[in-house]
Amino acid sequence: MSANTSMVTEFLLLGFSHLADLQGLLFSVFLTIYLLTVAGNFLIVVLVSTDAALQSPMYFFLRTLSALEIGYTSVTVPLLLHHLLTGRRHISRSGCALQMFFFLFFGATECCLLAAMAYDRYAAICEPLRYPLLLSHRVCLQLAGSAWACGVLVGLGHTPFIFSLPFCGPNTIPQFFCEIQPVLQLVCGDTSLNELQIILATALLILCPFGLILGSYGRILVTIFRIPSVAGRRKAFSTCSSHLIMVSLFYGTALFIYIRPKASYDPATDPLVSLFYAVVTPILNPIIYSLRNTEVKAALKRTIQKTVPMEI
């Protein structure tokens, strides 16, 4: 290997630098989204942790998802805000590696956790008599722990191998964070093995959980149509359809980015697609899964009444 094969020590994240006249507006938009995301998800964590009525397996997974979303969005958005505010878009090689690891870690964990949540809903609706056995506290801990372990394995399975490859220039990443595909395009050596690894991991971590989710909700919908009450069917169908829209948005956009070879990465459109699973879904998840829930709203009301003694 020649002396200059790994000469790149930092990268330049282009992000939305081409929208020079909109930097201030973009900063305000992303700051608002980030603050709402953190506040909404943190609220869910606090409510589930403190309210005795929210101690079922469903809320255990919702609390885990909310904590996950705070970390997930914090990997990318604060750095994006810094770039928009200062105009300095450089990131060190080690910083890029850390960002990639944690993004993969949180993203893979969410892929597995959403499948566990779908299984929880299936068990609650389709197997109500066996639900306490199927989703015991021990089983919930095992499912959540397996999801977190999966995230660690994915992060460690990709990041060290990619950043052990030679980067000899250019160092410009047409993205607002260090995502695998655009980073791989900067590698000087052969990346065919890495690309195959990404495709296999994508099939395992996106297609398989998404298939399990669709299967679970398919069984749930069959059960829903057997509900005699029209109002009950409508309410259950509304909840399931909103959940399916969310998981389809998350898995679909991630699949679009990661299932393709690096040569097909489009710097004009792919960063916009990445926004959906990196920025949009973390703010929508607490709304779709929790804040529309009557039990969560009742818990919020009780918490406010305890904090501020007054008539609500």
UniProtKB/Swiss-Prot annotation:
InterPro entries: GPCR_Rhodpsn (IPR000276), GPCR_Rhodpsn_7TM (IPR017452), Olfact_rcpt (IPR000725). It is a multi-pass membrane protein. It is found in: Cell membrane. Residues 1-24, 75-98, 160-196, 258-270 are extracellular. GO terms for biological process: detection of chemical stimulus involved in sensory perception of smell. Belongs to the G-protein coupled receptor 1 family. This is Olfactory receptor 10C1. It comes from Homo sapiens. The lineage of its organism: Eukaryota, Metazoa, Chordata, Craniata, Vertebrata. The gene is OR10C1.
